[in-house]
UniProtKB/Swiss-Prot annotation:
The active site is at C201 (acyl-thioester intermediate). This is Octanoyltransferase. It comes from Burkholderia pseudomallei (strain 1710b). Pathway: Protein modification; protein lipoylation via endogenous pathway; protein N(6)-(lipoyl)lysine from octanoyl-[acyl-carrier-protein]: step 1/2. GO terms for molecular function: lipoyl(octanoyl) transferase activity. The gene is lipB.
Length: 254
C-alpha cells in the first residue's frame, strides 16, 4: 500500500460549514470521506469507530475507513468461542459488538469500515447490507471473478469453478443510534492458513479463498480503490458504479 499508517484520534467529528450544508435542487450525493489508514492494529480501529459514532451529529459526513490489520481473530457479540478451534494459535482474539461469529483479519486483506448515517440516507439495515454485498460482487467482477450471495450466510462466495462456495468476503455491522460501524473484508492476497484454526463465520469446514488463488493479479491498493468506488456508488443508490465521478471520492490521511 502507498498510504502510511496514521494515528486515529476520533474527537468530535467536524460538521460541514453552513454553505456546504445547503442542499442544491435536485439534491447532490451526500459526501463520503475516505480515510486510508494503512496497517493499523484492530483495537485502535475498534475503539476509534465507536468513539466516532458516539460523537457524530446529524451533520457529520459519513466515512469509509480502509485498513489492513495485523493478524487478529474477531468474535461477534453473539459469537460462540468454540468456533476458535486452536486455542494457542498465537493470533489474538478480540470480542467485538458487531453481528456474526468469528472471522480472521490479516495482511493482504482489505478491511473497509462503513460509518454511515442510515436515517439521513433513508436506508434500512437490510438495504445497506444488500448494497455492500453488491459493491463487493461488482469489485470482484472487475477482476473477472464471479461471486454471489448465499442465503442465510452473510458474505460473498465464489460462484463457479473448483472453489465454488468458498468464502472470499465477510460482512458484519453494528447499528447504534441509527448509524453503522464495522463493515466488510475482502481477501486479496493473504496467508489463508489462520482460517483453518476457526469455523469461519460459524460454519465448520467452510473453505476460505483469496483473489490471488483464483488467478487475480491486482494488488491490494488497486482492488481497494475499486471497492471504495463501488461502495460510494451504492451508498448513493447507484446501479452503475463505473459512473461515479472522480471528484466524488474524497481521500484523506488526516
Amino acid at each position: 500500500m502507498s498510504a502510511p499508517p496514521v494515528s486515529i484520534v476520533p474527537s468530535a467529528p467536524a460538521a460541514p460549514d453552513a454553505a456546504a450544508s445547503v442542499a442544491p435542487n435536485p439534491p447532490a450525493a451526500l459526501p463520503v470521506t475516505v480515510r486510508w489508514l494503512g496497517e493499523t492494529p484492530y483495537d485502535a480501529c475498534f475503539d476509534a469507530m465507536r468513539a466516532f459514532t458516539d460523537a457524530r451529529t446529524p451533520d457529520t459526513d459519513d466515512e469509509i475507513w480502509v485498513v489492513e490489520h495485523p493478524p487478529v481473530y474477531t468474535l461477534g457479540q453473539a459469537g460462540n468461542p468454540a468456533h476458535l478451534l486452536v486455542a494457542d494459535s498465537g493470533v489474538p482474539l478480540v470480542k467485538v459488538d458487531r453481528g456474526g461469529q468469528i472471522t480472521y483479519h490479516g495482511p493482504g486483506q482489505i478491511v473497509a469500515y462503513l460509518l454511515v448515517d442510515l436515517r439521513r440516507r433513508k436506508l434500512m439495515v437490510r438495504t445497506l447490507v444488500t448494497r455492500i454485498e453488491e459493491a463487493v460482487i461488482e469489485t470482484l467482477a472487475a477482476y473477472n471473478l464471479a461471486s454471489a450471495r448465499k442465503a442465510g450466510a452473510p458474505g460473498i462466495y465464489v460462484e463457479s469453478g473448483p472453489h465454488r462456495g468458498a468464502k472470499i468476503a465477510a460482512l458484519g455491522l453494528k447499528i447504534r443510534n441509527g448509524c453503522s460501524y464495522h463493515g466488510l473484508s475482502v481477501n486479496v492476497k493473504m496467508d489463508l492458513r489462520p482460517f483453518l484454526a476457526i469455523n469461519p463465520c460459524g460454519y465448520a469446514g467452510l473453505e476460505t479463498i483469496d483473489m490471488a488463488s483464483l488467478g487475480a493479479t491486482a494488488d491490494w491498493h488497486e482492488v481497494a480503490q475499486t471497492l471504495v468506488r463501488r461502495l460510494i456508488a451504492h451508498l448513493d443508490g447507484a446501479t452503475a458504479a463505473a459512473a461515479l465521478p472522480q471528484q466524488a471520492l474524497e481521500q484523506s490521511n488526516d
